[in-house]
UniProtKB/Swiss-Prot annotation:
UniProt source species: Mus musculus (Mouse)
GO molecular function: ATP binding; GTP binding; identical protein binding; metal ion binding; protein serine kinase activity; protein serine/threonine kinase activity
Changes seen on gene knockout: Knockout mice are born at the expected Mendelian ratio. At 4 weeks of age, their body length is slightly shorter than that of wild-type littermates. They progressively develop severe osteopetrosis, reduced bone resorption in endocortical and trabecular regions, and increased bone mineralization. Knockout animals have lifelong accumulation of bone, and females are resistant to ovariectomy-induced bone loss. Osteoclasts derived from mutant mice form a reduced area of resorption pits compared to controls, suggesting dysfunction of multinucleated osteoclasts.
Protein name according to UniProt: Leucine-rich repeat serine/threonine-protein kinase 1
EC class (word): transferase
Regulation: Activated by phosphorylation by PKC. Binds both GTP and GDP; binding of GTP stimulates kinase activity. Sterically autoinhibited in its dimeric state.
Modified residues (Phosphoserine): S1064, S1074
Length: 2014
């Protein structure tokens, strides 16, 4: 046994009887047997005391269980005794018997102290001995001070371990910190082994204690293992071995994980492991004291996969004599770090599966001992090798090069002098820091170019680094700090485009070879630039591509004397370190360009060009300063001042006084807006740094009706001066509210001065008091009672108030000083140059130039009376034409525009909805005049009836303004933004200013007071600007929609009264809820209210004056009256109010700083109301009516259905009537879940996911079906009856409950309204518990599915077809939502649920989670919720957006579908938002890598920064219905070439040849990878005519009548041919025919003169013999064709095909086909598909519906496709390929002779007999060949001129359902006119198309474009590519017993038009079609298509057809 010879420590001898003193005699063994206790108790001195009889009595009483007597006796003795020693004895007795009460009495009342020495009679020792844990706790806690005496604890612990008291042991170790590794020792004693806690526990057999100790810091020592071998083994086996997670390779046995780490084992016994050695898969022996191991470890553990031996004292592992002894071949991981190995065991070299080897922190001097390593395989699977912290001097190549799978190598902190030569392995991470490396090998880029990501060669002795290090394409982190580098390789040769971190600190960069600093740094050895004089050296340069990737650059501690210029171009840099470069004195201004830089280290640099105070402020300030320098920034003192206030308050007069210092003489005209300039000099005594401030003053006045318009001129960073008339007193103060709210709404946090005029009208003696009162009123408006700023109002304090007299000018100087002081303190937040004061801020020169250009443009336009706005394109042009323009990116342009807006040069609104942000208004006066036209409309019935104007009338108002048809949409959006004209339908707008201020008739007469009424009051701190206008517009839209729904339901019933429209509320009391209808008699609306009356009740919403002092309303009052007591209308109204506030006025949902809500809802008690109505006195109302707080109602509704009113407790009020929205009474009864049928638990196992705002989604069952339940959790009171009346806690809980109810209601309502196959259906709702049930997605979210499938594939983890279908279904769902005016707002893969991953299923996904969706009432939407990364960049606070935000998210989801990855752009929301707004998008890959061209293009279109450039969901749906979308993979430009050849085998390669003689070269394209594998490889020789690949050789025919055969073995390039053959003519085509003999072929070479040469080939080499077949001879002798016949012309062989299972070869002979019988190698038959001058150009075989072989051929003149039945040689069909619109063409197929015995036999006389229809062929110079046919076909072949007259019109491709069979194309898109299959036979094809209408091309070119190029067999379909680039796809289908052909698709990629004409095409590897295009310059481009067969097309068409059908069904169901 290894390790048994070790001697135990020397103190082992100290085991004696004295050691047993800790264990009292047998008398102490039992709890009762304490009678001898007295005799054993000894004094600290050791002498026994004589026991008094009372002690004996106490013992006896305890012994007899007479506790009370014992306690009485003990207390008596205690009272009598004075001796502390005696009291100590009493404490010991009580402790021994576990009498806790007495122990507490003695400790607390008698103050008995516990001794700290561990004597036998110490009460704590005694208590521990008997195991009284509570007594021990009490005793130890009585000790004074924070620390318990360690000796006492250790003694007690050893004792408790021996006695087996686990609770005491736990208490001592866990609570009091006793150390399980410490010996129990008394004073002046030696430690004894039996007093070691673990030893004592194991010896006494206390297993549970032993395990507890081992788990809390105790270790095995050699004494324990020697003295208790079996118990030790038992413990190790039972408690430290568990079942392994790794699979077992041993049948029937459990795989084991041995965890013997951190036990300080001195040895491992072989016996411990022997019987389980076959089961061990993981063995952890780390952190022990092992000097050696038994021989079985690790070599004999056959199933071992993980071995950890780290932190031991191993000098070596057990030796093995031969490799046969090593049976641990399954080992995957070994950790042998922190040992004493001098070399690795040679046995490791035999572990062929080892993946990870950690051997750091050893004494390795050699890797392996070479002499002992014999016949080893090498660690070929090793991925990670860690050799850090050793003594290695070299890494032997013979070992390193065997590591073929190595991905990570760490050799840091060794003594390596050199690094091994690179070898072939996928190395990703290489760490070699802190060695003695003097050079690095060159060839890193050869082997690790695309793998190595992280390289660390820091702290070495490198003087230079090889170029290859910077040519590693995947390199992300390169650390070279702490070397002796003088220069780096030339940057123009770098290719490390992914580099993120480059650390070059602590080097010699900037020194020359002599050690002296150069004048100009030659840091990078690049080509020197000529400088003045003879100096030629180069600055440090970085390649331009690093600007995209490099984030961290360290150049500190070098010898640089200038910042390299290229550093300033690294725009992505976030950290730059330049410190400790003594020569660096200046920072270039260009550094300011680095917008992402947040860390700039310039420590210990003496920078002269940045002031010290700027440097102190940190990197941001330094960069801002440099940016200002770079951009030639100038101090700008121009600001915008806006003067506002009610009319006739003295605004213009005040302005003139400020400008001139004099009172004006003339009154001003009532213009709406006046603009003027004013310069204010610095007042005397001011300490401001600016001399003067210049204002662009906008004096906004005009009539009161225009007040709402004026808010559009309010912009940020302007100074607002609100002017009011002091003389008008409180009334004028009330009027201020409107202006102050307007300013805060449109320019939050603006600086506002409130200036009172007419000071002279207040009598002097009352002036001070009166002004103080008025000031208090003003402050009361905009500050809360506590003094904090009121929400919704600007921040106005007494410092912002001023008074002035415009008559005697009193206060004018003070006002000037105030304006100057306030202006100088205004901050320029969010500036590009940095946060600074607005006055005197630095503005880039280019912004100021642009300002000048804009002002000049405005001047030019006003002189020419032109329109005063710019479009975004015009502004871009203006920017580009501005001299010195340095505005480059989108963000910078936005900053420039902000500057123009802030200075009053421009007006611009960044809303993206309807493209409003694309207009820039130059002149506010002009805009005001345009708006005045609308305000000049009087409410006449002609133009605007009831305040509603038709869109065409609104357009008429634009005539003469300069707004065009292109910009009217933006103008209308502008009107809606400022509530001037709000859309109420698609073609009508509400003009709120035309509405009367009060209802036009007495509404009170309509409201009959009755009992059946409920009310709701919204009390608001302020009513936001625009609230009523938007509310009334929404109500009009909703009422109209409801009328329409009712009208649709009642289409067949006529209305009794035409003037009456029907209006429906849903929900009635019957059965909780059902549907209830009323007739809407009248709808009346005014500026702040709306009333709808109907038979049996009414509904009214109006403003309520909550506060008399606020003239503007302070709330909303809703009344709903219904004789049927159906109050669900209240839910309808409150929904509208709440959603409007949430979306447009969220400020109202906040609270004041003192916690009071800004908006509160109250419900007057209807019972009180009814009784009050009988009283006449209105003053009594407030006392007699109870107002329920909505919060109370909500909290009560959680638990009960009624609420009690304190005024009539006996009459409870039903909550269902009071707050119907909480009980969802407007929902149909069928949607309420029966709770008894809902089975769900809320355990963790059933959680499917988390929703927003704390909702949880559970898996459940309803009526036996699986469902998903979305549960809204509301916090409950423990005891709601006694809940505190008015606490903040209650308010918070109520707010939480209301939020939950509101979210629940919004989402449930939305789900209820949505019915679409791609949208998750609502199954039902429940109030108790608050939840709704949805369909359950069987496969979870798309994100989960993608992450599960993305591991194995690089693109499209779900496969191509499924990706297409899912993308289509998402777009379809979005299109439906947008049609319903719903903006999803949170589209992401988490919210897309997956139903099926089968491409055959009709529905694969559904959209879910409408928690933050927005209903858009034709007006766009506001709000910033969403998920960063998916959220469109235009979603920002206060920006109105439209449904295009969903299209941005859709683009991101497409990225996920294509890549399988989340669109990650950073970890922080701000970082992501910034990147997206800059136009940075996730990187996907080139189209040829992704291979889904259209979807990738759509993705990029969707995530365009400009919303108007994104497509609509509806247009995406229609795009994706075209099969081209799905089948077009990519196009690949291939440069100039001369010939294209495809391989006929299973390979994906095609080959181009170019040039001739010496310059002849070839290019190989791998179409599977979209890669040019070989580019222009030279292969001299003549120009090619033809090429064929046969097995591993290539046959190449050239124009000099030769065939060269090249071998392809060993992937060597084609250089020297193996063999050359001569032919009598040029070879025009090849064909390889397999022969029955293995590896034998016949190679047929068709020649230009019509001959066919036959070469037998065996094992890749042709035999000597070669035979020829002569077409001419066969024609003459066999088929009797005379020589003068045109068919006997010498036609080149253009096409050959193997037919009839290889028994025949058919080949072209001019217009005919000749058949070779392969068995006798003779021409046996001739077929006549065409007549001369046509020539067969293409030939292919495929199967028909019955699986019989058909041969298709194509010619070059008639453009006709002919089909033969190969077995009978019968011509079965013809199809003309020249139809400009071939989709849906059909042609009949004649049955073959075999099927119909009566049909005539084919002969070979001529073409006429073979025609299956009446066909004539004619040829003319003009039109070429035409086939004139008179068969029933969809294509009219009457003459070619029928195409020369009509453009190719797009047929409406609506789907139709046809009877489907296995190979029928039931899903081909058909015109809706042809509903049944019979009528499909006789379509009418119009022939009114003219050729010149088709396109710019002429007729001949047009017919050329329609010429078919080739016929291809793709699976079971025929593809016919045409010169124009489109592909006709033809299929055969069964048709009432016979067959017919049909064009099932036409594929046309418009992207290919610019690449010329389609020249050739081929099928490669059976499933891919490659078309080659060439233009006039012989530049070629490949278009690669997915080779779809009938099955794929069927799935494709059915997918959208079926979706359409399901959609229609859903609509019908509704």
């Amino acid at each position: 046994m290894a390790g048994t010879s070790q001697r135990p420590p020397s103190m082992y001898w100290c085991v004696g009887t004295e050691g047993l003193a800790v264990c009292p005699g047998p008398a102490m063994e039992t709890h009762n047997g304490a009678e001898d206790m007295g005799s054993k108790l000894s004094l600290p001195g050791g002498s026994s005391t004589v026991q008094c009889p009372s002690m004996e009595e106490i013992h006896t009483a305890y012994k007899q269980r007479n506790l009370s007597r014992a306690r009485d006796l003990l207390r008596g003795v205690c009272e009598e005794s004075e001796s502390s020693q005696e009291k100590g004895q009493l404490l010991s007795i009580a402790a021994a018997h576990g009498d806790l009460e007495t122990v507490q009495f003695l400790l607390t009342e008698k103050r008995v102290e516990l001794p700290t020495e561990p004597t036998d009679d110490n009460p704590a020792v005694v208590a521990a001995h008997f195991g009284h844990a509570e007594v021990v706790r009490e005793l130890l806690e009585s000790l004074p001070g924070p620390c318990t005496p360690q000796r006492l604890l250790n003694w007690m612990l050893a004792l408790a371990c021996q006695r087996g008291h686990l609770e005491v042991v736990k208490l001592l170790v866990l609570t009091h910190g006793a150390d399980p590794e410490n010996y129990a020792v008394r004073k002046n004693e030696f430690p004894v082994i039996v007093r070691l806690p673990l030893y004592a526990a194991i010896k006494a057999g206390n297993e549970d204690i032993a395990i507890f100790l081992l788990r809390h810091g105790a270790y095995f020592c050699s004494y324990i293992l020697l003295d208790s071998p079996e118990p030790s083994k038992h413990l190790l086996r039972k408690y430290f071995i568990e079942a392994s997670a790794l699979p077992s390779s041993y049948p029937g046995k459990i795989a084991l994980r041995v965890k013997w780490s951190h036990l300080k084992l001195p040895w491992v016994d072989l016996d411990w492991l022997l019987d389980i050695s076959c089961q061990i898969t993981e063995l952890d022996l780390s952190a022990n004291c092992l000097p050696s191991l038994p021989s079985i470890i690790p070599w004999g553990l056959i199933n071992l996969k993980k071995l950890n031996l780290s932190n031991n004292q191993l000098g070596e592992l057990p030796c093995v004599q031969s490799s046969d002894e090593i049976i641990c071949s399954r080992l995957l991981e070994i950790d042998i770090s922190s040992n004493k190995l001098s070399h690795l065991p040679p046995g490791f070299l035999h572990l062929s599966k080892l993946q990870k080897l950690t051997a750091s922190k050893n004494y390795l001097e050699r890797l392996f001992e070479e002499e002992n390593a014999t016949n080893w395989i090498g660690l070929r699977k090793l991925q990670e090798l860690d050799l850090a912290d050793n003594r290695l001097t070299e890494l032997p190549v013979q070992f390193m090069h065997s590591f073929k799978s190595l991905t990570s190598l760490n050799v840091s902190r060794n003594n390596l002098k050199s690094f091994p030569d690179p070898w072939s392995c996928p190395l990703k991470c290489c760490k070699a820091s802190k060695n003695a490396l003097e050079s690095l090998p060159d060839k890193m880029a050869v082997f690790w170019k695309s793998h190595l990501r992280d390289a660390d060669f820091s702290e070495n002795s490198l003087k230079e680094v090889p170029l290859g290090l910077f040519q590693l394409d995947a390199l992300m982190f390169l650390r070279l700090q702490g070397n002796q580098l003088l220069s780096l390789p030339p940057q123009e040769k770098w290719t490390c485009t992914q580099l993120k971190t480059l650390d070059l600190s602590r080097n010699q960069l900037g020194k020359n070879e002599d050690g002296l600093k150069t004048k100009r740094i030659s840091l990078f050895t690049t080509r020197g630039r000529q400088r003045s004089g003879t100096e030629t050296a180069s600055m440090l340069e970085f390649p331009a591509f690093l600007s995209e990737s490099l984030e961290v650059l360290c150049l500190n501690d070098n010898h640089l004397d200038a910042v390299p210029p290229s550093v300033c171009l690294l725009k992505n840099l976030s950290e730059l370190y330049l410190g400790n470069n003594p020569g660096l004195r200046e920072l270039p201004p260009e550094l300011g360009q680095l917008g992402n830089l947040w860390q700039l280290d310039i420590e210990d640099l003496n920078i002269s060009n940045v002031p010290a105070e700027v440097r102190k402020e940190g990197p941001k300030a330094t960069l801002s300063f440099l940016r200002a320098q770079l951009r030639k920034a100038e101090k700008c003192k121009l600001m915008k001042m806006i003067l506002v206030g009610p009319p006739r308050q003295g605004k213009s007069t005040l302005l003139e006084i400020l400008q001139t210092g004099k009172a004006p003489q003339l009154a001003h005209s009532e213009a709406t807006i006046r603009t003027t300039k004013w310069e204010l000099q610095r007042p005397a005594g001011s300490k401001a740094k600016v001399e003067s401030v210049e204002f662009n003053v906008w004096d906004i006045g005009g009539p009161a009706s225009m007040a709402t318009v004026n808010q559009c001129f309010f912009t940020d960073k302007a100074l607002y001066v609100v002017v009011w008339n002091l003389a008008l007193g409180e009334e004028a103060v009330a009027n201020l509210q409107f202006w102050l709210l307007n300013i805060e709404a449109k320019a939050p946090n603006a600086v506002v001065l409130v200036v009172g005029t007419h000071l002279d009208l207040i009598e002097a003696k009352f002036r001070v008091e009166r002004i103080a009162t008025l000031r208090a009123y003003v402050l009361a408006l905009c500050r809360s009672p506590s003094g904090s700023r009121a929400t919704g109002f600007p921040d106005i304090t007494f410092k912002h108030l001023h008074e002035i007299s415009c008559k005697n000018l009193e206060g004018q100087e003070g006002l000037r000083q105030l304006i100057f002081h306030v202006t100088c303190n205004m901050k320029d937040v969010g500036s590009t140059i940095g946060c600074q004061k607005l006055a005197g801020r630095l503005i880039p020169r280019s912004y100021i130039s642009l300002q000048e250009a804009v002002l000049a443009e405005q001047q030019r336009r006003s002189l020419g009376d032109q329109v005063q706005y710019l479009t975004d394109r015009q502004l871009d042009q203006l920017v580009e034409q501005t001299p010195g323009n340095d505005i480059k990116d989108y963000e910078d342009l936005q900053s420039a525009i902000s500057f123009l807006i802030e200075t009053g040069t421009l007006l611009h609104f960044p809303d993206t909805s309807h493209g409003l942000r694309n207009l820039y208004f130059l002149d506010p006066i002009w805009l005001s005049e345009c708006l005045q036209r609308i305000f000049n409309i009087k409410g006449s019935r002609s133009v605007a009836k009831n305040g509603v104007i038709q869109a065409e009338d609104l357009r008429m108002l634009l005539v003469g303004t300069g707004f065009t048809q292109q910009t009217e949409e933006q103008y209308f959006q502008f009107l809606a933004k400022f509530e001037i004209a709000l859309p109420v339908a698609n073609d009508s707008y509400l003009l709120p200013h035309l509405l009367p201020s009060k209802p036009g008739l007495d509404t009170h007469s309509m409201r009959h007071p009755m009992a059946n009424t409920i009310q709701r009051v919204f009390k608001m701190s302020f009513v936001p600007v625009g609230f009523w206008q938007r509310f009334i517009a929404r109500m009009l839209i909703s009422l109209a929609e409801m009328d329409l729904q009712l009208f649709e339901n009642k289409k067949n019933t006529k209305s009794r009264n035409r003037k009456v429209t029907i209006y429906s509320f849903t929900g009635s009391q019957r059965n909780r809820c059902s549907t209830f209808r009323v007739r809407r008699n009248q709808t009346i609306y005014w500026q702040e209210g709306l009333l709808v009356t109907f038979d049996g009740g009414y509904l009214s919403v109006e403003s309520s004056d909550v506060n008399w002092k606020k003239k503007k309303s302070g709330g909303i009052k809703i009344i709903c009256q219904s004789e049927m007591r159906d109050f669900s209308a209240m839910a309808f109204i409150t929904d509208h109010v709440n959603s409007l506030i949430d979306q447009w006025f969220p400020a109202l949902t906040a609270t004041e700083s003192d916690g009071t809500p800004l908006m509160e809802q109250y419900v007057p008690c209807p019972v009180c109301e009814a009784s009050w109505a009988q009283h006449a006195d209105p003053n009594e109302r407030s006392e007699s009516v109870q107002y329920f707080d909505m919060e109370d109602c909500v909290l009560t509704a959680i638990e009960r259905d009624f609420i009690s009113c304190p005024r009539h407790p006996d009459l409870p009020v039903p909550l269902q009537e009071l707050v119907p929205e909480l009980f969802m009474t407007d929902f149909p009864a069928r949607l309420f879940l029966e709770n008894s049928k809902l089975e769900h638990t809320e355990g963790e196992n059933s959680i499917l996911g988390q929703g927003g705002s704390g909702t949880v989604i559970y898996q459940a069952r309803y009526q036996g079906q699986p469902v998903a339940v979305k549960r809204f959790h509301i916090k409950k009171f423990k005891n709601s009856a006694n809940a505190p009346a008015d606490t903040m806690l209650r308010h918070l809980r109520a707010m939480d409950a209301m939020k939950n109810f509101s979210d629940f209601r919004q989402e449930a309502s939305m789900l209820h309204a949505l019915q679409h196959p791609c949208i998750v259906s609502l199954i039902g709702i429940s109030i108790h518990p608050l939840c709704f049930a949805l369909e359950l997605a069987p496969l979870g979210s798309l994100n989960t599915v993608l992450s599960e499938n993305a591991k194995d594939s690089s693109f499209m983890p779900l496969g191509h077809m499924l990706t297409q279908k899912i993308a289509y279904q998402i777009a379809s769902g979005l299109a439906y939502l947008h049609k319903k005016n719903i903006i999803f707002c949170d589209l992401k893969s988490d919210n897309i649920l997956v139903w099926s991953l089968s491409a055959k299923e009709h529905i694969n996904i559904k959209l879910s989670d409408y928690g933050i969706s927005r209903q858009s009432f034709h007006e766009g939407a506001l709000g910033v919720e969403g998920t960063p990364g998916y959220q469109a960049p235009e979603i920002r606070p206060r920006i109105v957006y439209d449904e295009k935000v969903d299209m941005f998210s859709y683009g991101m989801v497409l990225y996920e579908l294509l890549s399988g990855q989340r669109p990650a752009l950073g970890h922080h929301q701000l970082q992501i938002v910034k990147k997206l707004s800059k136009g940075i998008r996730p990187v996907l890959g080139q189209p040829e890598e992704v291979q889904f061209h259209r979807l990738q293009a759509l993705m990029m279109e969707c995530w365009d920064t400009k919303p108007e450039k994104r497509p609509l969901a509806l247009s995406v749906v229609s795009q994706m219905k075209d099969p081209t979308f799905a089948t077009f993979m990519y196009m690949l430009p291939c440069g100039k070439q001369s010939a294209f050849f495809s391989s006929q085998s299973q390979e994906y390669t095609v080959v181009f040849w170019d040039g001739k003689e010496e310059s002849r070269n070839y290019t190989v394209v791998n179409t599977e990878k979209g890669l040019l594998e070989v580019q222009r490889m030279t292969c001299p020789g003549m120009k090619l005519s033809c090429q064929l690949k046969v097995q591993s050789s290539v046959w190449i025919a050239t124009e000099d009548q030769k065939i060269y055969i090249y071998s392809l073995k060993g992937m060597c390039p084609l250089s020297v041919p193996q063999q050359a053959l001569d032919t009598p003519a040029v070879v025009t085509c090849f064909l390889a025919v397999p022969v029955i003999k293995k590896n034998s072929f016949l190679v047929l070479a068709g020649l230009a003169d019509g001959l066919v040469a036959v070469f037998p080939v065996a094992r890749g080499t042709p035999k000597e013999s070669c035979s020829y077949l002569c077409s001419h001879t066969a024609n003459r002798s066999k088929f009797c064709i005379p020589d003068e016949d045109a068919r006997q012309n010498p036609y080149p062989v253009k096409a050959m095909e193997v037919v009839n299972s290889g028994s025949e070869v058919w080949y072209s002979n001019g217009p005919g086909l000749l058949v070779i019988d392969c068995t006798i190698l003779d021409i046996s038959r001739r077929l006549e598909p065409y007549a001369a001058p046509s020539m067969v150009t293409s030939l292919v075989c495929s199967s028909d519906c019955r699986g019989e072989e058909m041969v298709w051929c194509l010619d070059d003149k008639a453009n006709c496709l002919v089909m033969y039945h190969s077995a009978t040689y019968q011509l079965c069909a013809r199809y003309f390929c020249g139809d400009p619109n071939p989709l849906r063409d059909t042609f009949s197929v004649q049955p073959s002779v075999l099927e119909t015995p009566g049909s005539h036999k084919t002969t070979s006389k001529g073409p006429v007999e073979e025609c299956i229809a009446d066909v004539s062929i004619m040829y003319s110079e003009e039109l070429g060949t035409q086939i004139l046919t008179h068969q029933d076909s969809l294509t009219d072949y009457c003459s070619m001129s029928s195409y020369s007259s009509s453009p190719p019109h797009q047929d409406p491709r609506s789907p139709s359902s046809l009877p489907s069979s296995l190979t029928s194309y039931s899903s081909v898109p058909f015109s809706a006119n042809y509903e049944d299959s019979d009528r499909l036979q006789e379509p009418s094809v119009t022939s009114d198309r003219t050729e010149h209408d088709l396109s710019p091309m002429d007729g001949e070119t047009f017919s050329q474009h329609l010429q078919a190029v080739k016929v291809l067999a793709v699976k079971d379909l025929i593809w016919v590519p045409r010169h124009g680039g489109d592909i006709i796809v033809i299929g055969l289908e069964k048709d009432s017993g016979a067959q017919r052909g049909r064009v099932i698709a036409v594929l046309k990629a418009r992207e290919l038009n610019r690449h010329g004409v389609l020249v050739d095409a081929a099928v490669v590897a059976k499933d891919t079609v490659v078309c080659s295009f060439a233009n006039e310059n012989t530049e070629w481009c490949l278009a690669v298509w997915r080779g779809w067969g009938a099955r794929e097309f069927d799935i494709f068409y059915q997918s959208y057809e079926e979706l359409g059908r399901l959609e229609a069904c859903t609509r019908k169901r509704r």
